[in-house]
Swiss-Prot record:
Keywords: Nucleus, Ribosome biogenesis. The gene is rrs1. Involved in ribosomal large subunit assembly. It comes from Dictyostelium discoideum (Social amoeba). Its main location: nucleus. This is Ribosome biogenesis regulatory protein homolog. Residues 161-177, 236-245, 290-311 have a biased composition (Basic and acidic residues). It is found in: Nucleus, Nucleolus. Residues 161-187, 236-266, 290-317 are annotated as: Disordered.
Amino acid sequence: MTEEIVNASDILTKKLDGHLIDGEDTLLYDLGNLTAFDHSSLNKTEYKSNPNEYINKLSRDNVQLLISRLFQLPIKEIEEGSLALLPRCTTPIPRERSLPTSKPKTRWEAFAEIKGIKKKKKSSMEWDKEHEEYRPTFGYKKANDVANDWAMLARPDDKVGEDPFKKLEDEKNDRVSKQKKREQRNFDEASMRQMSNVGKTLSFDKEHRGQIKSDMEKVFDVAKLSTASLGKFDKRVENEKDAPKRGKKKLAGLGAGDVAQESENNSKLIDRMFKKENVLNVDKATRQFVKAEERENYSKKRSSGGKDNKSQKRFKK
């Protein structure tokens, strides 16, 4: 099947002739994200006379301009239908979640990167000369296994009376134990990089007591939910607080689908922008400032230990 690319602007006038917008197009388009931005100023008189009608008319015209611009893009015909070839996105959209962190490198990976050593993939099968067949390179019944030989060549460094087979087995056990130690060391180093508190001794002075208490409460809350019933049928300790209820986080106003509520919120926002009165709540700001000062004075008294107050009281007596 041959793929044909046609220009949708050729059929735009035939299909949407009665819905085209007359006037200058001042929108900024990002067709890759299917969005358009209107930076023109609002007409205050029309907005104050009928806000809802003005917002609806402006939104309808802008959406129609966006659709008209989309129809000017080339279209690719495939078996399932027609596809518009969108350009590259120009507006950066923030990520929903943070960027994934790279996995910490092991000691060998860091050493190989410095030395420029590249890992070569070794074949899983190897030719066994004795049995004249291909066998696994490692593991059970591996090829050219020295341990299966009934005779071994003597070496100059062999000691008299030493069992070469026993020596070979001991060397293998030593290599395995050393490899396990290296794996454990790499695991500890990687976990130390991920958790900054690992390896640090706890300090029970006054400065760290609050942090230690909050950490213990978090650990206790996690332990209460670690059973199969999520702590529902566990025995409760005397004066034990209920476990915190963790609900689903929801971003209010995003994708709710309530068009009327969204338009009402937008109209309220525009009303606040065009208000002549100051939006700042002076009483609320004053109360917050006074509370901040009281909190700061209280923390200063706690840090000084209240020695000045005690000395003043003694002097008065």
